[in-house]
Amino acid sequence: MTFRNCVAVDLGASSGRVMLARYERECRSLTLREIHRFNNGLHSQNGYVTWNVDSLESAIRLGLNKVCEEGIRIDSIGIDTWGVDFVLLDQHGQRVGLPVAYRDSRTNGLMAQAQQQLGKRDIYQRSGIQFLPFNTIYQLRALTEQQPELIPHIAHALLIPDYFSYRLTGKMNWEYTNATTTQLVNINSDDWDESLLAWSGANKAWFGRPTHPGNVIGHWICPQGNEIPVVAVASHDTASAVIASPLNGSRAAYLSSGTWSLMGFESQTPFTNDTALAANITNEGGAEGRYRVLKNIMGLWLLQRVLQERQINDLPALIAATQALPACRFIINPNDDRFINPDEMCSEIQAACRETAQPIPENDAELARCIFDSLALLYADVLHELAQLRGEDFSQLHIVGGGCQNTLLNQLCADACGIRVIAGPVEASTLGNIGIQLMTLDELNNVDDFRQVVSTTANLTTFTPNPDSEIAHYVAQIHSTRQTKELCA
């Protein structure tokens, strides 16, 4: 039997994990084992919302050392994280300034300024990336305007996963899938766009040319002295999650469900027409030259904040209580900027309902019901937008990531979208990370080959849409009202 041992470091906005994958070549089986799990979260430092990258690095090294202490010879390591955020370094590799998080308010108003000065359509034609107020282009503009004293000291800007790879190997890399989330990469050249960089205030010398997934960045020397390759995987966690989505055919869509919900489809070509611009569709880079045509949805961030504020520890009990409530009494737009990082999420949700003359969700279950129903309805709207964009309906939706364990939300999604939902795998980002490592090690041929492995080894659950559910009737009523308005226009 031939085995490969690959380690995935998968960092999310609320937690991180070091996972060991064991791949058996002869039977093409893949097993995962959690080695180390640790918390991540936002911190307040010198007036900014930041990440504690030192704590994260310590946790990563602890997890890697645990694997080595078991006597396991690691064949490769890969790191994936969230997008858009970065760490600045001087010429000696020391940090400059703070690792500010995307939920910080320093970028307020800058996206509108960019659209006015450069032209919204021109930015979109160059980058193909959706307009989000915290994209790296606006973060860099905020930095250069608000902290000009830092500029002379900056020699390099590394996105978060590239920073941790650098800390392990001493080698710098700018991985393509994550680089595209910055809104600074030209969609035609796959290199940094000089016009967009100039507006951001950043120096092009801070960046190296983006590299596609599948190359070895450098080596980490383990405590036992072995040199272990660190692979540039699809380092944006959604890109890794999509790689592990067992998409079957061109009519399959995906929903990577976690702190954020990312809904989209794979395409060999980007969509940058006026329809895509109007819908704020993004064309993020994927593996093998594919595009992740998708839309960001605020996701379970709202629930995470409610759980924190209400000190709720028993999530299954909350979901059971939520399921007993009638649907669609409290509806908000989860993508409203007011929910990016409010002082109090519960109060913000209640205020949104009050301002739209709805009943006010008061208790824990009502707040959760509001979030789940609102997300499911937004999923239905986005899926419809995506189908219209490409001119073909979808036949199934694959929900992957930690959020796919929420069976109530999965069923609400199936009912609201009127589509078969396949939930799993849960550890999609980790698996996609491992998939690129196995391809780099010449164990697998390509992404489609890896998806066959995932389909046979992952635990998948199917949710069939119920047209008689409350939320399905609500969606039908909305569509009927919309059609009436269009006919009368």
From Swiss-Prot:
It catalyses: L-rhamnulose + ATP = L-rhamnulose 1-phosphate + ADP + H(+). ATP binds at A13, S14, S15, G16, R17, T259, Q304, G402. Its cofactor is Mg(2+). Keywords: ATP-binding, Disulfide bond, Kinase, Magnesium, Nucleotide-binding, Rhamnose metabolism, Transferase. Substrate binds at G83, H236, D237, T238, N296. Its EC number is 2.7.1.5. One of its GO terms (biological process) is glycerol metabolic process. The keyword Lipid metabolism does not apply. Pfam families: FGGY_C (PF02782), FGGY_N (PF00370). GO terms for cellular component: cytosol. Belongs to the rhamnulokinase family. Monomer. This is Rhamnulokinase. It comes from Escherichia coli O127:H6 (strain E2348/69 / EPEC).
